[in-house]
Amino acid sequence: MVANSKESETLTGASAVTGLPQKRFYRQRAHSNPIADHSFNYPARPEDVDWRSLYPSMGDDQQVQFADIGCGYGGFLVTLGEMFPEKLAIGMEIRVKVSDYVIDRIAALRLKNANEATTYQNIACIRTNAMKYLPNYFQKSQLEKMFFLYPDPHFKRAKHKWRIINQALLSEYAYVLRKGGLVYTMTDVEDLHTWIVSHMTQHPLFERLSDEEANADPITPKLYQSSEEGAKVVRNKGEHFLAIFRRI
């Protein structure tokens, strides 16, 4: 699989002040139908993924350990890169313009911070459908952390099967997560939160962290405002519903 990081290209719509891409040039609808037949270039198996094209500075023994599923415009992914410079984190986004924005954003951050302590060489984004192709990218027990932040709630009952958390997909997540690995979920929709907690706690390979454990995690405070969607919820004085689960 050839992955294009676009670092050598001129960034379309980049701000003359910051050098970073501007979201107004990458607007797209809030969600995309995960069941529709989108056209994706995906690997046949994890061994075929050209990770070095995404992480030029990665070591020979390094693997991607963090996955931000439905990473949106990449705000939380950037935060992960800053918090864990020694870890490789991937953002997976189904919307073409949004994934283009994140790819361009990372390229601009790498260029701008080439001589800084944080170079953003440890984060990358790919356009894919994680509901279909996750096992094509990751080996068994490869991931340490997975993030599902403000996923599409699919309000209509007939579309609940499209929700990113369901019993069938949880078995795939358990496959790519190592034992002791964590799944972080955050939403501003209480009904979806209830759905997530119900399905995760019913699955035999996941257990929910206690409030004390969740609050002690250094990532937890970042879940509320690091992503663009989370920041919007804060601006609108909405509620956040957090649940973190451990792979057992």
Curated annotation (Swiss-Prot):
InterPro entries, alphabetized: SAM-dependent_MTases_sf, Trm8_euk, tRNA_(Gua-N-7)_MeTrfase_Trmb
Catalytic-site annotation from UniProt: D152
A GO MF term: tRNA binding
HAMAP family: tRNA_methyltr_TrmB_euk
Protein name: tRNA (guanine-N(7)-)-methyltransferase
Gene3D superfamilies listed in its UniProt record: Vaccinia Virus protein VP39
Disulfide bonds: none
Pathway: tRNA modification; N(7)-methylguanine-tRNA biosynthesis
GO annotation, cellular component aspect: nucleus; tRNA methyltransferase complex
Domain of life per record: Eukaryota
Subcellular location: Nucleus
Reactions catalysed: guanosine(46) in tRNA + S-adenosyl-L-methionine = N(7)-methylguanosine(46) in tRNA + S-adenosyl-L-homocysteine
EC number, as in UniProt: 2.1.1.33
Binding locations of S-adenosyl-L-methionine: G70, E93, I94, N129, A130, L149, S227, E228, E229
Broad class of the protein's primary localization: nucleus
Keywords, in A-Z order: Methyltransferase, Nucleus, RNA-binding, S-adenosyl-L-methionine, Transferase, tRNA processing, tRNA-binding
Top EC class of this enzyme: transferase
Function: Catalyzes the formation of N(7)-methylguanine at position 46 (m7G46) in tRNA.
Family the UniProt entry places it in: Belongs to the class I-like SAM-binding methyltransferase superfamily. TrmB family.
PANTHER family hit by this protein: 3-DEOXY-D-MANNO-OCTULOSONIC-ACID TRANSFERASE/TRNA GUANINE-N 7 - -METHYLTRANSFERASE (PTHR23417), TRNA (GUANINE-N(7)-)-METHYLTRANSFERASE (PTHR23417:SF16)
Organism in which the protein naturally occurs: Drosophila mojavensis
